[in-house]
Amino acid sequence: MKLKLKNVFLAYFLVSIAGLLYALVQLGQPCDCLPPLRAAAEQLRQKDLRISQLQAELRRPPPAPAQPPEPEALPTIYVVTPTYARLVQKAELVRLSQTLSLVPRLHWLLVEDAEGPTPLVSGLLAASGLLFTHLVVLTPKAQRLREGEPGWVHPRGVEQRNKALDWLRGRGGAVGGEKDPPPPGTQGVVYFADDDNTYSRELFEEMRWTRGVSVWPVGLVGGLRFEGPQVQDGRVVGFHTAWEPSRPFPVDMAGFAVALPLLLDKPNAQFDSTAPRGHLESSLLSHLVDPKDLEPRAANCTRVLVWHTRTEKPKMKQEEQLQRQGRGSDPAIEV
């Protein structure tokens, strides 16, 4: 056993000596190691350069976001709103004015159905912060709705909308606010916004660049979830409506806007108070555009951005009872 261990140890010693001698011999031989070392150094240099570039990009400030056009460069939106005295008038006008205040480059034409300007409307306009023109015209007695009469018997707001068109065409009549009409060449769009509808701010940007007459759907109108144009390949080919679809323009008053230059080029185009039921919008649009040339907006008329809402008429039974007792609400407090 001892002999075997001795032989193993001797063999290990001889192999180690042989390996050492071989290594010593190789140290004296020439070695072509420089090219691989140079390649490795170049790779390290390229990596260092890329790291420096990435660090510089991280330190660089982000690019400024694209800026929207300056307000002065935007076409003006002229919003025409007829209004009349009633208990909810101020509430309606406050809501609408605060929506309009979110829209840049907007001019509000508020037209009262009255003999003269009322303190309520004058004060509201002055406090609104909006660029406005205050107009007044009284609806003729023969065209007024009687108590309890349905709204379709006489279309409301005809005289008031036409009064606003007269002002835009330079025929005067302003009783407050901006009294000078837009100068020739003004780029703008005219929209007829009733005081009781609900409007998305997006709607006004959809209409701003109207070239002729633009259109879109209106929600909660005509006994339907919405009414609006039907669009195919970017063109209006029909209308989704239940009430008399054969009308020349079966659209709601809130569902279109007209380029200001087009209205000024057609000085006789206005609303006809004698138009058949449901044809009031058509009485104006028929003078301005062919249905095939309507400009669909709101994602090809697939989005509803305005709603034909109605505020419930307040019930004043308790107020009337207190008034009979001489204890009615203070009339000096404006509501």
From Swiss-Prot:
Q: Where is this region: Disordered?
A: 312-335
Q: Which residues lie on this side of the membrane: Cytoplasmic?
A: 1-7
Compositionally biased intervals (Basic and acidic residues):
312-322
- Where is UDP-alpha-D-glucuronate bound in this sequence? P82, T83, Y84, D113, R156, R161, D194, D195, D196, H308, T309, R310
Which CDD domains does this UniProt record tie to the protein?
A: GlcAT-I
Please give the Gene3D superfamilies that the UniProt record associates with this protein: Spore Coat Polysaccharide Biosynthesis Protein SpsA, Chain A (3.90.550.10)
Q: What is the effect of changing E281A?
A: Absence of enzymatic activity in presence of uridine diphosphate-glucuronic acid (UDP-GlcUA). Does not increase PXYLP1-induced 2-phosphoxylose phosphatase activity in presence of uridine diphosphate-glucuronic acid (UDP-GlcUA)
Hey, which stretches end up on the Lumenal side?
Answer: 29-335
Reaction(s) catalysed by this chain, per the record, are:
3-O-(beta-D-galactosyl-(1->3)-beta-D-galactosyl-(1->4)-beta-D-xylosyl)-L-seryl-[protein] + UDP-alpha-D-glucuronate = 3-O-(beta-D-GlcA-(1->3)-beta-D-Gal-(1->3)-beta-D-Gal-(1->4)-beta-D-Xyl)-L-seryl-[protein] + UDP + H(+)
Which Pfam families is this protein grouped with? Answer: Glyco_transf_43
What keywords are assigned to this protein?
A: Disease variant, Disulfide bond, Glycoprotein, Golgi apparatus, Manganese, Membrane, Metal-binding, Signal-anchor, Transferase, Transmembrane, Transmembrane helix
Q: Which residues are glycosylated?
A: N300
EC number(s) per UniProt?
Answer: 2.4.1.135
Where it sits in the cell: the answer is: Golgi apparatus membrane; Golgi apparatus, cis-Golgi network
Please name the InterPro entries in this protein's record.
Glyco_trans_43 (IPR005027), Nucleotide-diphossugar_trans (IPR029044)
Biological process according to GO = carbohydrate metabolic process; chondroitin sulfate proteoglycan biosynthetic process; dermatan sulfate proteoglycan biosynthetic process; glycosaminoglycan biosynthetic process; heparan sulfate proteoglycan biosynthetic process; positive regulation of catalytic activity; positive regulation of intracellular protein transport; protein glycosylation
List the residues marked with site Interaction with galactose moiety of substrate glycoprotein. Answer: E227, Q318
- Broad class of the protein's primary localization: Golgi
Kindly state one GO CC term assigned in the UniProt record.
Golgi apparatus
MF GO annotations: galactosylgalactosylxylosylprotein 3-beta-glucuronosyltransferase activity; glucuronosyltransferase activity; metal ion binding; protein phosphatase activator activity
Q: Does the keyword Lipid metabolism apply?
A: no
Show the segment(s) annotated as Interaction with galactose moiety of substrate glycoprotein. 243-252
Oligomeric state and interaction partners are given as: Homodimer; disulfide-linked. Interacts with PXYLP1; the interaction increases the 2-phosphoxylose phosphatase activity of PXYLP1 during completion of linkage region formation in a B3GAT3-mediated manner.
Please state what the protein is called: Galactosylgalactosylxylosylprotein 3-beta-glucuronosyltransferase 3
Q: Which organism is it from?
A: Homo sapiens (Human)
**Name of the gene this protein is made from:** B3GAT3
